C-alpha cells in the first residue's frame, strides 16, 4: 500500500474512531444528566432503568441472532447452488483469501432490483447475498469489487458495531417514553420536560449512528479498492450501473444492508460517474441516509485509485 492510500485509510479510521469516542462521551454525559435528574426530582426508579436496559439488550441480541433468517425471508435469499453458481462462489473464496478471512456463504436473492449485501450472526454465520439482477448487469471484475466491499463489512464486524452503538439511542428513547409514567406525580412537569429532552437526545444520537454507518460504508469501499486489483475503478462502474438500472431500495431498516440505496435517472455509466465527480454535495445531502452520497463515494475511490 503506497503512502497516499495509507493516509486516506488512516483519515477514515480517525474520523470513525473520533465519532465512536464522541458517542461514548455523549452517552456517558446523558447518563450523568439522567442520574442528576433522578437524584433531584426522583423521576425514575433504578429498577425500571435496569429493566429497560435488559429488555432492549435482549431484543437487540435476539434480532442479531435470528436477523439473517429474517433477511433471507424478506429478500427471498437461498444458498447458492454450486452447480449453477460455482464461478461466483469461486470469486467469493478468492476475495476472502485476499482479505485473510474464511469465505462467507453465498446466497442468491430473488428480488427485482440489482444489489448486494453482507449479514451475519453467531448462529447463522457469515453470509453474502447477491440479487439475481445484479449478476445480469455487472461483469466479473465489477462483481469481484462489490464482493470486496461486502467482505470488508464482514472483516470489520460492521453488523456487530452498528448493533452495539444503535443500542444507545434506543435505550434513551425508551427511558424517555417510560419517564412519563414512572415519575413521582408531584414532579409531573419535570418528568415531561426530561422526557422531551431525552427524545431530542435520542434523535441526535440516531443522526450520529447514521454518520458512523456512512463511515463504515466508506471503509468498506476502501477495503475493496485496496485489496482487489483495480478495485476502485470497478467499484465505481458497479455503483453507477446499480444506480442507473434503478435500485428500488429505500431508507428502511433493512436498507442499511445494501451496497447502494439511491434512485436516480437512467444515464450512461461513464456520464453518471463524471457527473458525480463534479457534483456539489451539501452537508445535508446524506444526513439522514446510512450510505454516503454516490458523489462522495466516487471521489474517495478516485483518491484511492490515484494512490494505488
From Swiss-Prot:
GO cellular component: plasma membrane
UniProt topology in membrane: Multi-pass membrane protein
Compartment(s): Cell membrane
Single Gene Ontology BP annotation: proteolysis
Binding site for Zn(2+): 149, 153, 217
Cofactor(s) the record lists: Zn(2+)
EC number: 3.4.24.-
Active site positions, chain numbering: 150
HAMAP family per record: Pept_M48_protease_HtpX
Protein name in the entry: Protease HtpX homolog
Organism listed in the record: Thermoplasma volcanium (strain ATCC 51530 / DSM 4299 / JCM 9571 / NBRC 15438 / GSS1)
Amino acid at each position: 500500500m503506497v503512502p497516499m492510500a495509507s493516509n486516506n485509510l488512516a483519515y477514515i479510521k480517525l474520523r470513525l474512531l473520533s465519532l465512536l469516542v464522541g458517542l461514548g462521551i455523549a452517552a456517558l454525559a446523558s447518563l450523568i444528566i439522567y442520574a442528576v435528574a433522578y437524584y433531584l426530582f426522583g423521576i425514575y426508579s433504578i429498577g425500571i432503568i435496569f429493566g429497560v436496559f435488559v429488555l432492549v439488550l435482549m431484543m437487540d441480541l435476539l434480532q442479531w441472532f435470528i436477523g439473517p433468517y429474517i433477511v433471507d425471508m424478506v429478500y427471498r435469499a437461498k444458498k447458492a447452488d454450486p452447480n449453477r453458481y460455482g464461478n461466483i462462489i469461486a470469486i467469493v473464496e478468492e476475495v476472502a483469501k485476499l482479505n485473510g478471512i474464511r469465505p462467507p456463504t453465498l446466497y442468491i436473492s430473488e428480488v427485482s432490483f440489482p444489489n448486494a449485501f453482507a449479514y451475519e450472526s453467531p448462529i447463522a454465520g457469515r453470509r453474502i447475498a447477491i440479487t439475481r439482477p445484479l449478476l445480469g448487469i455487472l461483469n466479473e471484475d465489477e462483481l469481484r469489487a462489490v464482493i470486496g466491499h461486502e467482505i470488508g463489512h464482514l472483516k470489520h464486524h460492521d453488523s456487530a458495531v452498528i448493533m452495539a452503538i444503535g443500542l444507545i439511542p434506543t435505550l434513551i428513547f425508551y427511558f424517555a417514553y417510560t419517564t412519563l409514567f414512572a415519575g413521582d406525580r408531584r414532579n409531573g412537569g419535570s418528568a415531561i420536560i426530561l422526557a422531551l429532552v431525552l427524545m431530542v437526545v435520542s434523535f441526535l444520537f440516531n443522526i450520529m449512528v447514521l454518520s458512523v454507518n456512512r463511515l463504515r460504508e466508506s471503509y468498506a469501499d476502501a477495503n475493496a479498492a485496496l485489496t482487489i486489483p483495480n478495485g476502485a475503478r470497478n467499484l465505481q462502474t458497479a455503483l453507477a450501473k446499480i444506480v442507473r438500472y434503478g435500485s428500488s431500495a429505500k431508507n428502511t431498516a433493512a436498507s442499511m444492508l445494501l451496497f447502494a440505496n439511491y434512485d436516480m435517472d437512467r444515464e450512461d455509466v461513464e456520464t453518471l460517474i463524471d457527473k458525480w465527480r463534479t457534483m456539489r454535495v451539501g452537508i445535508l445531502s446524506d444526513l439522514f441516509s446510512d450510505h454516503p452520497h454516490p458523489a462522495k463515494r466516487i471521489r474517495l475511490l478516485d483518491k484511492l485509485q490515484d494512490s494505488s
